Design a protein with these regions (language model features):
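Substrate-binding clefts and catalytic carboxylate motifs of secreted carbohydrate-active enzymes
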Residues: 36, 44-53, 216-372, 382-387, ...
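Aromatic-lined carbohydrate-recognition surfaces of secreted/lumenal glycan-active proteins
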Residues: 163-187, 202-205, 223-234, 272-275
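Beta-rich carbohydrate-recognition modules and glycan-binding surfaces
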Residues: 425-595
């Protein structure tokens, strides 16, 4: 063999490969231009680009098929590279968000160390992803100015510092910052204190139809992007006399999406918008903002946005709610009945299946990034129900919400709900089974927050997608050797060891079942229900466990017998514990349910 010729050949191959990689990693230039008529526009690779986008975790293939061209992130996660690659494959672009600390979450904008760390992180992220062809622009922060006047100068000066830094290292992508609407002095602050911010991103809901005019009245001159829009927020809705916010039906929400989009898009300063949210989300209720159900069915907002983005309606439209009405008063005495009448139909004439669910209402309505209350179905409340309505009787006092979901059976759905109140003292209510601690498609009211023992060695991935027992994900847990005893407990409330009220009445349950498997097989683990003793003010009314279970390499279902147990208040529904070990242990959990 001619060794010199061989080396030349290898060298040429390596150079060719590197050249290909450089080409593949080349940024697509994006410009921001203003025309003589006052209109602003993005140019991507020299061509006009109007953002037709959304944000959320639902399928990006469905998003591209719906006619959208962009999605946004709120921060830079470990999977951003994969998201950018998928976007490029699908012909989508990404507005990459850089999450900035919020003062209400403990971030101090007068703390030099915290600012330097945030600055360094943003710089590293920009350097890492600036040459990816799917990047459209950068978004610095999301509602980091807070909910008051939004005029804290040190926040805006830090944002200006970040924007100036990004412009030094990346000339290919415009920069925006995102605020919660435009009240207070937000517009003034961005315009006066942030000259290197090119675009104002605005999250707007009920106020979006009037936003373009209000922006001009505030002397807004920078182009803007509607970075979140959807139905009116809970803070914009007139509450009932007992303080509960009524929610629009999914059909009514779709009409609002259309109206809000058309008005905002008509502004010469608008560069596009992002519908919220491309997925499901529990915030205020289980259906307020989601454009999909947690089980994957689309709602009418998807149909409307598909028509707007693509210029044509989807072949299968969601069921239409023509009427959803509570008969009589929304406040009654214990034992009285509520009646709801429903008129729902499918545009294509498909038979519609209707599901009804009654839940207790939360004591407060959390928004944004606060830990959310999870609505759980109550048992033995609904007397009768059909596709025409429902009748229910609640034995005790409290505020409740009746949910209706209609399905066409081919991927479309519709939602409606109504808050109601029963006078008098709260009665002990039981929850409908099965109730999941962890399972795809189920609400999960307990958090895996109780990390115990030598927990520094632990890692937990709740969205592990390789070989789940069912659905799309399972839990992967790894304990890195060597370690002393360790474990994790699921809790309600999160991080509570018996000092706070919480938990659920699971009296109807006879067992807890779960599926588990070990990476190698033979892993010895204890599993149980209930940890908190009666010496705590708020304790688990039942405790039981399976000792030293030897896991198999293949999935196996296990069952914890709960017959005869007092399940009137379970705060710790599931836990596992491993004894000290000199070997790293990896195991998997799935489908943890009370039945």
């Amino acid at each position: 063999m001619n060794f010199r010729r061989y080396l030349k050949t290898v060298f040429a191959i390596v150079l060719t490969f590197l050249s290909i990689q450089i080409v593949l990693a080349q940024a697509v230039p994006v410009e921001l231009v203003k025309y003589d008529n006052g209109n602003w526009q993005l140019l991507r690779n020299g061509k006009p680009y109007f953002i037709k986008g959304t944000g959320g975790d639902a399928s990006k293939k469905l998003l591209a098929a719906a006619g959208a061209n962009t999605f946004r992130t709120w921060g830079v996660g470990q999977d951003l590279g994969k998201q950018l690659d998928e976007a490029e494959e699908l012909g989508l672009t990404v507005v990459v968000g850089h999450w900035l600390g919020h003062e209400r979450h403990g971030f101090d904008y007068s703390n030099t160390e915290m600012l330097e760390a945030q600055y360094t992180q943003v710089r590293e992220d920009v350097m890492k992803y600036k040459d990816h062809p799917a990047v459209l622009l950068w978004a610095i922060g999301n509602e980091m100015e807070g909910f008051a006047e939004g005029d804290n100068a040190i926040i805006w000066l830090h944002i200006q510092e970040l924007a100036a830094m990004i412009k030094e290292i990346d000339l290919n992508h415009p920069i925006m910052t995102v605020t919660a609407e435009i009240g207070g002095r937000r517009v003034e602050s961005v315009h006066k204190l942030c000259p290197d911010i090119d675009i104002m991103g605005i999250n707007s809901y009920g106020g979006l139809p009037s936003l373009p005019e209000r922006y001009k009245e505030l002397s807004g001159a920078k182009p803007f992007i509607i970075t979140e829009f959807g139905p009116p927020g809970v803070w914009e809705i007139t509450k009932t006399e007992f303080g509960a916010p009524p929610e629009l039906t999914s059909t009514e929400k779709a009409d609002f999406y259309r109206l809000a989009y058309e008005i905002s898009a008509s502004s010469e300063l608008c560069l596009g918008s992002f519908a919220f949210t491309w997925g499901s989300k529990i915030e205020v209720t289980s259906s307020w903002y989601g454009m999909f159900l947690s089980s994957g069915e689309k709602l009418a907002a998807v149909d409307v946005m598909t028509e707007i983005w693509s210029g044509k309606s989807p072949e299968n439209l969601c069921p239409e709610i023509r009427s959803f009405k509570l008969v009589g008063s929304d406040v009654v005495q214990p034992g009285d009945t509520f009646e709801i009448k429903l008129d729902v139909a499918d545009p294509e004439g498909v038979n519609v299946a209707v599901d009804w669910m009654i839940c207790s209402e939360p004591s407060e309505y959390l928004i944004a990034n606060q830990t959310q209350w999870v609505p759980l179905a109550l048992d033995n409340i609904i007397i009768s129900s059909s596709s025409k309505g429902a009748i229910l009787t609640i034995p005790g006092g409290g505020i409740y919400r009746l949910y209706m979901t209609a399905f066409d059976g081919i991927g479309g759905a519709a939602t409606a709900n109504v808050p109601i109140k029963v006078e008098g003292d709260q009665a002990q209510l039981r929850y409908k089974l099965p109730l999941a601690v962890y399972a795809d498609g189920f609400p999960q009211p307990w958090s895996y927050s109780g990390w115990m023992g030598n927990h520094e060695v632990l890692s937990l991935d709740p969205d592990y997608k390789i070989q789940p027992n069912s659905g799309e994900t399972c839990i992967k847990i790894r304990a890195r050797a060597p370690f002393g005893w360790t474990g994790i407990a699921w809790q309600n409330p999160a991080n509570d060891w018996g000092d706070l009220a919480g938990g659920y009445d699971l009296t109807s349950a006879t067992k807890l079942t779960f599926w588990a498997r070990g990476e190698m097989g033979g892993e010895l683990i204890d599993f149980g229900v209930g940890l908190l003793n009666s010496d705590k003010e708020f304790y688990d009314t039942a405790k039981t466990e399976l000792k030293r279970i030897k896991l198999k390499k293949k999935w196996k279902q296990y069952s914890i017998n709960l017959k005869g147990k007092d399940l009137s208040n379970i705060k710790t529904p599931f836990y596992w514990i491993i004894g000290g070990n000199n070997h790293t242990i990896t195991f998997y959990l799935d489908d943890i349910k009370f039945e």
